[in-house]
Design a protein with these regions (language model features):
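Substrate-binding/catalytic cleft of secreted carbohydrate-active enzymes
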Residues: 170-178, 182-355
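Secreted/periplasmic carbohydrate-active enzymes, especially glycoside hydrolases
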Residues: 1-190, 198, 228-229, 243-244
Length: 355
């Protein structure tokens, strides 16, 4: 329960509010410095005007305060909503990176003129510098080649499905990092918050889709995808592991690419994230691209091979010696034909990765 003067939630679809937005600027990687910017949408639902000051505290991974930024004094009329801002320099910064999921805690506070707390919100986030261009992607001033996994967004485990605790999400996503992957391309729909936060912790870059229909679409179906992307960006824009916004599983038109970029520019203009899709080599406005089954290169677009080892096996089958003792290839028909590619075991998948 909050005061009638409060910081909003990042729930745009239901509440039409955008919440907190925290981002870095003026990165000095070698000098370990970054300017931390905190923006908060504040609403006054009181029957009278309310005044407050806006503050931000930065805590490191050990809970030690490493930054305290004092903002301006604001006055909001009854029913008014306003975005307030504060920024300051963070020294001796730890930059989030592949395999190094360093996270800070940012506390944004509203205080009355007498110094009493009106409202505070705690946000976990990290800071990293990104650059896209000349066919390359740079993370913290170093070029990095993308390689990893295209994982079903369900990210399920045998026996429990999607209902997994956070530690199991960390274990699962850390396996991707420890096997040499620096990227997870979630398939078709936006992942749940637990997996997003898990990737923050283990240092795994994410490509985040909103919604997808296996191809570009028109009319109301495209409008729904835009709405999903807007909602997903607002809800997840403080998670440093998200670096790519995917407009669709396959390429989209130039007009649609521009619409997706407009959403990113409005709601995440400073997050250092690229908006693109697969098969976008011919769309100059796309900020990254890739191919399904082969390697391609571009003078402009950072690209990666997005499904070079396609495997549709169900994760619920380990091997023939483990419960449920599934025989390799057994299972229902798909469109009247055997579906071996779906009904095989994970030991077969592991062997194919080595091959």
């Amino acid at each position: 329960i909050t005061d009638k003067l409060y910081q909003t939630l990042p729930l745009y679809n239901n509440l039409k509010t955008t919440g907190i937005y925290i981002y870095g600027s003026n990165y000095d990687i070698a000098g370990k410095k970054v300017t931390v910017n905190a923006e908060s949408q504040v609403r006054n639902e009181d029957s009278k005007s309310r005044s407050f000051r806006f503050f931000a505290k930065i805590l490191d991974a050990d809970g030690k305060e490493v930054g305290h930024f004092d903002g301006e004094r604001y006055t909001l009329k009854p029913g008014e909503t306003k975005t307030v801002k504060v920024s300051g320099l963070l020294n001796n910064a730890h930059f989030w990176s592949w395999g190094y999921g360093y996270l800070y805690t940012v506390k944004t506070l509203l205080k009355a003129d007498d110094g009493s707390k009106i409202d505070d919100v705690v946000t976990k986030t990290g800071f990293r510098k990104t650059q896209f261009g000349e066919g390359k992607f740079y993370l913290n001033d170093r070029a990095i080649m993308m390689h990893g996994y295209a994982q079903r967004t369900s990210n399920e485990w045998p026996g429990v499905g999607m209902s997994v605790p956070a530690w199991l999400s960390d274990y699962s996503n850390r396996l991707m990092v420890e096997s040499g992957g620096n990227l997870v391309r979630w398939m078709h729909v936006c992942p749940w918050k637990q997996d997003i936060e898990s990737c923050d912790r283990v240092g795994l870059i994410q490509a985040m889709p909103a919604g997808d229909a296996e191809r570009d679409v028109e009319g109301r179906r495209w409008e729904q995808r835009l709405e999903l992307m807007k909602e997903a960006i607002i809800y997840n824009r403080n998670n440093p592991s998200i670096i790519f916004y995917e407009s669709g599983n396959k390429g989209v038109s130039r007009e649609h690419m521009l619409q997706m970029k407009a959403i990113r520019d409005e709601f995440d203009p400073h997050g250092g994230r690229a908006s693109g899709s697969r098969e976008m080599l011919n769309i100059n406005e796309a900020e990254y691209g890739g191919e399904m089954l082969y390697i391609n290169k571009s003078k402009k677009h950072p690209m990666w091979s997005m499904e070079y080892h396609r495997d549709e096996g169900l994760r619920k089958y380990w091997d023939e010696q483990s419960y449920p003792y599934h025989k390799e290839g057994d299972g229902p028909l798909y469109r009247g034909k055997p579906a071996f590619e779906y009904n095989h075991n994970m030991d077969t998948f592991a062997a194919s990765m080595v091959e």
